[in-house]
């Protein structure tokens, strides 16, 4: 069973839908997200990275709040670097006058910190239910159904439709049916 949407699922979203989804998302630790890094502003080309949120940093600004998301892998590597730096400090003194070009790499690297506005969540089934509820899908009276015998899942807006087995969105995967409902509400 598919547990969350994928990067491919995000490709069909309009810019308005991406912005709306970002606004509805309250990032939490261990959420999976897609981070977008502008590679060519003139041609509107972006590199997309899938990452796990390790930390959410919220800062108050004049205009409201600014949220940054730190990649879980980056948190782990920062901790490892701090530990090794302490060991090096205790082992010997570093001579900063010696410069070696091999000490630095100027290659493109995946970012460790993302602005929330540059990210889109790869929603889980539970997060999609939350978004449908926030958006008032079916005036709060929506339902999901999974028929194992027919290998069908669906989402509907009106409980009266459920009696007649009417579904707004159907798919073999509940995740895909919910995603179609979420896209419809965005």
Q: Language-model segments: what does each one mean?
A:
Residues 1-186:
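Glycine-rich anion-binding surface patch
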């Amino acid at each position: 069973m598919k547990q969350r949407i994928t990067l491919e699922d995000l490709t069909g979203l309009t810019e308005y839908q991406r912005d709306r989804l970002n606004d509805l998302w309250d990032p939490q630790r261990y959420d999976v997200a897609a981070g977008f890094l502008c590679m060519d502003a003139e041609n509107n080309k972006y590199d997309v990275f899938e990452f796990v949120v390790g930390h959410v940093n919220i800062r108050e600004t004049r205009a409201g709040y600014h949220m940054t998301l730190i990649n879980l892998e980056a948190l782990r590597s920062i901790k490892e670097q701090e530990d090794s730096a302490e060991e090096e400090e205790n082992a010997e003194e570093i001579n900063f006058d010696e410069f070696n070009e091999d000490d630095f790499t100027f290659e493109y690297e995946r970012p460790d910190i993302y602005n929330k506005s540059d990210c889109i969540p790869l929603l889980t089934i539970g997060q999609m239910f939350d978004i449908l509820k926030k958006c008032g899908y079916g005036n709060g009276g929506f339902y999901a159904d999974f028929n194992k015998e027919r290998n069908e899942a669906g989402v509907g807006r009106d409980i009266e439709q459920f009696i007649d087995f009417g579904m707004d969105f159907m798919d073999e995967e509940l995740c895909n049916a919910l995603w179609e409902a979420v896209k419809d509400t965005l």
